[in-house]
Amino acid sequence: MTYVDLNEEKTRRLSFYLAMEEWVARHMAEPECFFMWQVEPSVIFGRNQDVYSEVNLDYCRQNGIQVYRRKSGGGCVYADMSNVMLAYITTANEAQTTFDHYLRMVVDVLKQMGIAASWTEHNDIMIGDRKVSGNAFYHVTTSFPAIQAIDGKQTPTETTVGRSIVHGTLLYDTNMRNMVGAITPSDEKMLKHGVQSVRQRICLLKDHTKMTLPEVKAFIRGHLTNQTLTLTPKEVTEIEQLEQEYLSPEWIFGHNPKH
């Protein structure tokens, strides 16, 4: 599998990495691609969610947490620099088959780290009965150059293919108060109760391994990928242009389902 590398140290907005996933799916011909990313405190919510119902926007503004909408379904996710986000792009089309393949790969890597991980029918990765990773899926259709034989002549044309994107979290550590506060009512008592409840339902990778987060990332990359493709400055610029769609207020706030 090919690791897609930015070859830069800086941390970008979450919207850039969403655009990068989509760009890779639409422009790279490799059958399987993978990359990891980290972001400053952010909330990412699903394509069909109502941001005003699902996200505590006041809490996010007060605590410097950015808000983004993704093109996959599913619920709200809080991310910060203490956890890592995984992106997997493949030519496979069927959602559950793609999920199962991806989840099996990640669970197998965690097991090689000595962690007794498993996955559920809801496409979560668990350690025991606690969640360490949530994942979502969406599909894109794109075209690649091809050659077609017409009347005995080789004629340039395009072929339309489907690409699947799976992205998810891997909780190494996190700011639990922000995780809960960003997606729950602002009442202090409810926030405290929410933190306690979340602590009972999720687990942190740091409690199950002696590896640091950079070591975990290196281990995953080393076991899942066998070659690297580094994006060119031109390709990064194209991703930045695509990112503008994800930054549009109309996209973030204007796609709320009708009540």
Q: What residue ranges belong to the model's regions?
A:
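Active-site loop/lid in soluble adenylation, ligation, and acyl-transfer enzymes
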Residues: 1-52, 137, 199-259
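Active-site cofactor/substrate anionic-group-binding motifs, chiefly glycine-
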Residues: 53-76
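Short, conserved charged micro-motifs
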Residues: 53-55, 94-99, 178, 212-215
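FAD-binding core of FAD-dependent oxidoreductases
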Residues: 70-85, 125-127, 153-158, 164
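Residues forming anionic-ligand binding surfaces in small-molecule and nucleic-acid pockets
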Residues: 71-90, 188-206
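Contiguous, small/hydrophobic- and glycine-enriched helical/loop subdomains that border
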Residues: 83-126
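A structural signal for small-residue-enriched, beta-sheet-centric alpha/beta enzyme cores
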Residues: 138-141, 158-217
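Intrinsic disorder/low-complexity segments
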Residues: 142-160
